[in-house]
């Protein structure tokens, strides 16, 4: 007799598990963030460099001016600016200029009292212009000026090109011809004779000597008064009578007298005035200047080319957007000074390699995966891991990694824009002073640099914060992508992991990473948790009563087990029984 029995049995599977993952690294780097402090990451982009001192150089992409007149031999820049005989030449145009003379003086000619006026600033003023030329005609007729007629004085200390007595081309030494008597203050107007909207730099001054020489030359031994006025700027002087040492500061021939030299800047169309008494040095040829040339303290000669000229380090080639070290003024394509080294995160948070599944069990491996990373994600930061009989397979998701890199690139570009804006602010502050000595007060400059440094550091901290925090965003996107690809062939078990109803080796994982995965290709079996199997029994001596006895015994045992389980759950819910499960 044959009997048919329906048996209930549970079928288990050898499913694989697939998780989203992050690469591991054996060489952690540290970056600073706004809220998390220092964080170890898998890679960094250094943003700062510490330069070393080098020669000053020509600025790349622009003309750089060293000496005002390169072809004027044995002449200082002040000689050129005053028009000293034998120092007359063309000043080349330039977008950048080197302030190379620490204490500008003339190399000879008539001795000047440098410390009484701002005459030492005259070469610096001229350097601040891109185009500079000396007028071909005199601005006034000195011989017929008020208080004349005058004889134009010369000096043996100031030889001309024929080695005869001479004087500066920018001034006429007005010595009374016949009327050597004291005079009340006289006024002469200085017209604007430049063209093309140029600034006119007019040089003038006065001569003073001991009492005997003053009477001999001018008929008056008393101190003389002088005033200049242009563009609302008025300057007053009173001459000194006698008391000058024979040795001159300029190293020229001994002289009993001295001259005081000053200048005034006349804007287009504006007239200047000079009020004077005896001993005046009336203006003659004037400087016509236009455009702007950035000026920096440095030294000559200029060797080679550089991206940036820095007062302390010389010529620099820009390799990083920022630099640490000694702060000073700089011109050109320069890095910005910051107080501390800066690094931008170029990867993910540092994670040591996660432990394998077989070492910790499945749930232990999940914990290890979340704490650590996976080696083998070549050229990728985010990807997938598969755990199963084949071991551990790892594949990088290059699209997700590229998105992360694009975000870092965007942060770099934002920092670059911030750098440009700050450079423009610094450059603007310098340009505003182009008519002066072009030196900012050190304390104000340092305060500005310190403020900009703090802004940049904060921007880098916030960028690092955003890059690191975006890991969650990338992993969540990967998890959604993985879930969509796996579809009904896997069960979401949390923590970015899925239990598959099929095997998933390296080939399977590579397909997932490439976005070409198809579950049908990996022999998906029927996976019902309960299977009903029909079993046929031959008549081997078991009667129906025996079979029913076995069945009732099994059913009763199952019922008792269910009742016990329900009772335990009830007691636990009432807090009468505690239950601890250790993994």
Curated annotation (Swiss-Prot):
Signal peptide positions (record): 1-15
Main location: virion
Single GO cellular component term: virion membrane
Alphabetical keyword list: Disulfide bond, Fusion of virus membrane with host endosomal membrane, Fusion of virus membrane with host membrane, Glycoprotein, Hemagglutinin, Host cell membrane, Host membrane, Host-virus interaction, Lipoprotein, Membrane, Palmitate, Signal, Transmembrane, Transmembrane helix, Viral attachment to host cell, Viral envelope protein, Viral penetration into host cytoplasm, Virion, Virus endocytosis by host, Virus entry into host cell
Topological relation to the membrane, as annotated: Single-pass type I membrane protein
Disulfide bonds: 19-497, 75-87, 109-158, 504-508
Post-translational modification: Palmitoylated.
Keyword Lipid metabolism: no
One Pfam family, short name: Hemagglutinin
GO BP, one annotated term: endocytosis involved in viral entry into host cell
Transmembrane segments: 552-572
Family annotation (InterPro entries): Capsid_hemagglutn, Hemagglutn_HA1_a/b_dom_sf, Hemagglutn_influenz_A/B, Hemagglutn_influenz_B
Lipid-linked residues (S-palmitoyl cysteine): 579, 582
Glycosylation, residue list: 40, 74, 160, 179, 246, 317, 346, 505, 531, 544
UniProt topological domain (Cytoplasmic) ranges: 573-583
Membrane topology (Extracellular): 16-551
Superkingdom of the source species: Viruses
Subunit-structure text: Homotrimer of disulfide-linked HA1-HA2.
General function of this protein: Binds to sialic acid-containing receptors on the cell surface, bringing about the attachment of the virus particle to the cell. Plays a major role in the determination of host range restriction and virulence. Class I viral fusion protein. Responsible for penetration of the virus into the cell cytoplasm by mediating the fusion of the membrane of the endocytosed virus particle with the endosomal membrane. Low pH in endosomes induce an irreversible conformational change in HA2, releasing the fusion hydrophobic peptide. Several trimers are required to form a competent fusion pore.
Annotated family: Belongs to the influenza viruses hemagglutinin family.
Further remarks about this protein from its record: Major glycoprotein, comprises over 80% of the envelope proteins present in virus particle. The extent of infection into host organism is determined by HA. Influenza viruses bud from the apical surface of polarized epithelial cells (e.g. bronchial epithelial cells) into lumen of lungs and are therefore usually pneumotropic. The reason is that HA is cleaved by tryptase clara which is restricted to lungs. However, HAs of H5 and H7 pantropic avian viruses subtypes can be cleaved by furin and subtilisin-type enzymes, allowing the virus to grow in other organs than lungs.
The protein, known as: Hemagglutinin
The organism's taxonomic lineage, starting at the top: Viruses, Riboviria, Orthornavirae, Negarnaviricota, Polyploviricotina
